Amino acid sequence: MKIQLPEHVKQIIHRLQQEGYDAYAVGGCVRDTLLGRSPQDWDITTSAKPQVVKSLFSHTIDTGIAHGTVTVMLDHTGYEVTTYRIDGEYEDARHPKTVTFTGNLVEDLKRRDFMINAMAYNDTAGLVDAFDGIGDLKRHVIRCVGIPHDRFGEDALRMLRAVRFAAQLGFSIEEKTRQAVADLADNLQKVSAERIQTEMVKLLTSAHPEEMRTVYALGLSRVFLPEFDRMMETPQITKHHCYSVGEHTIHAMQEVQQDRILRLTMLLHDVAKPVCVTTDEKGQNHFKGHPAEGAEMARVILRRLKFDNETIKRVCLLVRYHDDRPAVTPRNVRRAISRIGVENMEALFAVKRADTLAQSMYERQKKLSYIDAYEETYREILKEHQCVQKKDLAINGRDLIAQGMKTGKEMGEVLQALYEQVLDEPQLNNKETLLALALQLQQTKQE
């Protein structure tokens, strides 16, 4: 079986072989190539010790030298080169206390997480597949190398990685591997929020975000996202819905692009429904206030999972306004754009459509027609270059200073008042008119 290796990878392998060492491309890059996917990274495993690797290449970085890893830099691209090793006992469900270097490739492959990731390749030896990884690729199965409880005991994040790979590849998790996840799910508490976040985002932005069902079923979400468990367990007894909050959420995620902000928004858009639910005398559920409450809950969750501030800001804004329904008039839509931000409107329309398509058929066409009208009005406003941001005003502070106004609170109030008027009456947005209005406002304040 022939794999086309990138030139830099061939170069590194060849250089190590020239010095009498074994070297192979290994892990995910081999898996992805066999699946016809483009690897994000190419990792290399070798019998050469780290100091030897460092001596053979002019530009290297000690990325994990204690565990045998040196990054070789070629043309500003990094390639991790790791010495064959046997891992000692793991101390924190993440790192081995000790590693022992070995000259045996198969011993190195034994320590890896899943069979599909335990294959190696070079042009001389071809594919080295000691654990039938190719068979699991053909069967579309995620299966641990060796005893699943041992692999997950070594690194608890592997449990979430199993589900993430299932989501990315469209595979299923083999039964013994699945059972081990269920047995050891609580160990995920030992893993940092940053590592969990990385795996969660990869899962959510995959082709199969519905694997969040597996995250819930195996007990993983109760460790890092217990709010999702409550969503899965909260029914929606209303003609507008046909799924529980959690199932609706999963369907909504499937209705948006594989985009980080959109998938996170759909994951959290109804997060407050379990805490806002009320039931009327007819037995129907209502979720009044859930968008605003959800935005606050989303902020807490995203901070807990160590997301960056910009992601938190955008997701929380979209959660807050996902169910906002202004009357579709140019004035109302201009004010909505001003409130939400022109840069967020495209995402908001995607969120609204996904939310609607994940509901029952009750009034679906009416709801979609409303979104279409909202978006059409928004586009007309942009096409006509109407003022929807303060920076779009035909005047600014410098113009007011030139007219004799002093800087400070009063100027800010005048600019805000002019902006409010222009949102209602866009034809006012010209310099001459606004300067005259500013003068009137200033005189009124002085009276």
Where are these regions (language model features)?
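Catalytic cores of the polymerase beta-like nucleotidyltransferase superfamily
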Residues: M1-E447
